[in-house]
Amino acid sequence: METNTLLSFENLIDAVGGSLIGSKSSNFCFSSAAIDSRKCVKNSLFVPLIGSVQNGHIYIRQALESGASVVFVANSELSENKANFENLAKEFNATFIAVENTMTALQKAAKRYVEQFPSLIKIGVTGSSGKTTTKEIIASVLSQKYSVVTNEGNLNSETGLPLSVFKIRAEHEVGIFEVGMNRRGEIS
């Protein structure tokens, strides 16, 4: 695996079913993930989401300027912008990966990352109300004996949870994750 990276290039490409745009960076590495370009730091994976109002792809340059080193790009953005993405990859020595859907790719990458920790005890907290408090109480009790990782605050959504699992490290013994939903059938 590349030094200090959460997933190797090959593992990431395989997990997300992606393809390389341009060339792989000579120093491929990502040690965190972000969906907000303003939250990118050195060696971040930037995942630009496409919403009903905004398209995160317009913030790729800002993410790279903030330190992002790996970028997912939705296939739907490639036809008009492939040359631009290739130029940005060269300019910033970054790795760009084309994926069908950036949200789904984030979730698949997070799933693959968690699979690297088979001995991690995983606890999911769901419910109508009180999830964050319950998660914090469980974490407080278990942290007396174990090294515990949790999602921060109430980052429990379809984007927040995948971003949170990238905080798991080898020293963690227990992961306690709050899982929220905003539509029927979202948790399965």
Model regions: which residues?
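Phosphate-binding loop of NTP-binding sites
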Residues: 98, 103-188
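N-terminal leader/targeting and accessory segments in enzymes
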Residues: 1-108
